Amino acid sequence: MPKRDAPWRHMAGTSKVSRSGNYSPSGGMGSKSNKANAWVNRPMYRKPRIYRMYKSPDVPKGCEGPCKVQSYEQRHDISHVGKVMCISDITRGNGITHRVGKRFCVKSVYILGKIWMDENIMLKNHTNSVIFWLVRDRRPYGTPMDFGQVFNMFDNEPSTATVKNDLRDRYQVMHRFNAKVSGGQYASNEQALVRRFWKVNNHVVYNHQEAGKYENHTENALLLYMACTHASNPVYATLKIRIYFYDSITN
């Protein structure tokens, strides 16, 4: 004997909803995306042992949340003699862009922007490379040292720059990268995009002053050195540098 239909089946505008249906926004993409998502988001016990042994924590050791951020937006005139800027200048305060006490940890650095040439320089046939160095100053004092004071170069060429022997204990190059632009009448590449993201886990220590300045650092200041390889044609850099940091629990 067949079962009698439920009364709501004959009502207009109603339909039975299946419990086993997949009504997620990505459900129409097929089973391939579901399998891929399931594989990416698989539980930790299904991953290789190296993922379980060397998993880095979200919050650095000895620190507490929330994750704070500070941005440095500036247009730089990069020449052959080099330029330096401090990217760990954090003012003391209670905001999401301030440090609570003397100590904090810069977990990551994000550099975004472009390098470009002036219209007059763009018409000259030449190639110019801009080199960036992310340097940790372990014992900052006074004002940041110039590019030529920190790096030793052969024939004053920035592409051969290495930290001087007597400063290797104080200055440590954490990352280095370069970008290239070229000028000319026909095949010119007048600008180049810059995008870098690094995990540094750099523990910065300030003195009792509240202002975020290089002179108030006592340990591990982060410096960004910039220099171009062409001696007579400068390059401009429009950069937005973000650092993500956590306050120390010992403040």
From Swiss-Prot:
A motif (Bipartite nuclear localization signal) lies at residues 3-20, 195-242. A zinc finger (unnamed) spans 54-71. Residues 1-35 are annotated as: Disordered. One of its GO terms (molecular function) is zinc ion binding. It comes from the Viruses. Keywords: Capsid protein, DNA-binding, Host nucleus, Host-virus interaction, Metal-binding, T=1 icosahedral capsid protein, Viral penetration into host nucleus, Virion, Virus entry into host cell, Zinc, Zinc-finger. It is found in: Virion; Host nucleus. GO terms for cellular component: host cell; host cell nucleus; T=1 icosahedral viral capsid. Gene3D superfamilies: 2.60.120.20. Encapsidates the viral DNA into characteristic twinned ('geminate') particles. Binds the genomic viral ssDNA and shuttles it into and out of the cell nucleus. The CP of bipartite geminiviruses is not required for cell-to-cell or systemic movement. Homomultimer. Binds to single-stranded and double-stranded viral DNA. Interacts (via nuclear localization signals) with host importin alpha-1a. Belongs to the geminiviridae capsid protein family. This is Capsid protein. It comes from Bean golden yellow mosaic virus (isolate Puerto Rico-Japan).
